Amino acid sequence: AWGESSSDDVTLEPGLWVLDNYGTKLVALIYNGSCFEWDSSIANPTGTRATLISGAPTSSRHMLVSPTDRHLIFFGTETTIGDTTTQDDMFIRFSDQESLNDYTPTSTNTAGTQRLAQGSRIIGAIRGRDTIYIWTDSAIFIMRFVGQPFTFSFEHVGTNCGLIGKNACMEVDGTAFWMSENGFFQYTGHLQSMPCLVEDHVFDGLNSTPRDLINCGLNNLFGEVNWFYCSSGSNVVDRVVTYNYLESVMLKKPIWYTGTLARTAWADSSIFEKPHGCYYTTSDNSSYDVVGNTDGITIYYEQETGTDQVDAGGTVTAITANVLSGDFD
């Protein structure tokens, strides 16, 4: 009845952000929400707040910028822009080329829409070498820029291979890797199920409820693709399964590792010489003043070195260094 409490569990989708670059602008989408832009080229950019992108959809599951043609693409978005009640989990909308604000298809622009047919919702999408990979909960599609009059082509290339969580995928040197609800897959121009001797260990011990917390990270120093996930009984990431694609090629057999390395976010070595990652711990409180934050902290690591990027002098901060971790096996 109204006004009475309920003891039933409620599962909410996490408030994940999607970030991408559009020239000097950062575009940022809150999961199932609106999209913002922040311009780094203006005077005093760090003193300027991000603003909503005018004319853009106001409720979307995912977004990215196409790699060569500069269209802003929204996935699982509104069929009528500005009306959140029209959000369709299988609907795709893309802007006019070189525009963040024009989404109305006309005979003189390249804006457009597409609805995918296989699956019940789009889970995630990533840029590849020459394509965009799109996963639903049951299939994979390839999206390619083809120019006028269609702008993009959409090809259904796999079934019964959906993505388990929106960040559980990546591409390495033209090969897409991802974790599904029923195993691991790769796409190299054709779909392949990946033989995995530790598959039972992973999926029998997986908490699939917080599936959007699963994240995939590349460690190119060792030729490893890592999936960080929540084990049974845990609501935070506390396990990892790793596929070593370099050793698998050299030894001509699939090489997998498992472990308890917990990373809630991951960035491979590029700007920095080593990979960087974060993990969440409930055993500590934040050392900075955040009202109401008594449930734990997120700790930031530079893998392999133990360097505190905030204060190399060693003053205690909310960002803690790690010990030398060695190989990720």
Which stretches of residues belong to each language-model region?
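Surface-exposed flexible segments
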Residues: 36-46, 80-100, 146-148, 234-249, ...
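Hydrophobic or amphipathic alpha-helical targeting/insertion segments
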Residues: 22-49
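Residues within well-ordered beta-strands of beta-sheet-rich folds
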Residues: 25-27, 71-73, 242
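Beta-sheet repeat architectures centered on beta-propellers
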Residues: 1, 11, 16-21, 120, ...
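Beta-propeller and closely related beta-pinwheel folds
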Residues: 2-13, 43-215, 249-258
